[in-house]
Amino acid sequence: MAYQSLRLEYLQIPPVSRAYTTACVLTTAAVQLELITPFQLYFNPELIFKHFQIWRLITNFLFFGPVGFNFLFNMIFLYRYCRMLEEGSFRGRTADFVFMFLFGGFLMTLFGLFVSLVFLGQAFTIMLVYVWSRRNPYVRMNFFGLLNFQAPFLPWVLMGFSLLLGNSIIVDLLGIAVGHIYFFLEDVFPNQPGGIRILKTPSILKAIFDTPDEDPNYNPLPEERPGGFAWGEGQRLGG
């Protein structure tokens, strides 16, 4: 019975969020079980382009370090904000969501050549958080019961938290930068006088991922409750 409930809950996660989160968990599990090592996964331009280890372009986004607080923290944020984006502003637009993944991954890989980062998964998570926060500007957040703020400040609060933990903020800044580029090109520039939509999802992605029918049993994660693990519950201003 418990297995069936977990299975149904798992299958209710939208496809892109389910696939990416599962890939991250399985990759970490494989490293933890010593089936593979991080040295086989990290981003290394020389190994990619000279030795054709193309898989590193993907695997460096899937490993978040050994199982521990940092891994759990990243997985919770990745799952929650990836799912809320897919069920919110990308509802019924799976191809556009996949294209955002590809565009963000491409920019991070390009910038990664200059900032010497070997794993980009955390930056990718911050990008998702940034896009969600800009598209939900009136949602109020609570940071461990200590700090109240509106959603657009969330990426910066997370960066400050990383700084307090003694981590490098380069990863957070990269995620914020890529998230802002996507948000500007997709949401801001097209609505300016004379603006055009530069980011157009290729028709092949639409043919593969977009389906005309919507599942009547779909149970979305409420976008107005972004608090989640250890954050308290978010609430809209005026609500």
UniProtKB/Swiss-Prot annotation:
Residues 229-239 have a biased composition (Gly residues). Signal peptide: none annotated. GO terms for biological process: endoplasmic reticulum unfolded protein response; ERAD pathway; negative regulation of retrograde protein transport, ER to cytosol; positive regulation of cell growth; positive regulation of cell population proliferation; retrograde protein transport, ER to cytosol; suckling behavior. The chain crosses the membrane at residues 58-78, 97-117, 151-171, 173-193. Ubiquitous. Overexpressed in various hepatocarcinomas. Pfam families: DER1. One of its GO terms (molecular function) is signal recognition particle binding. The keyword Disulfide bond does not apply. Residues 79-96, 172 are lumenal. Belongs to the derlin family. This is Derlin-2.
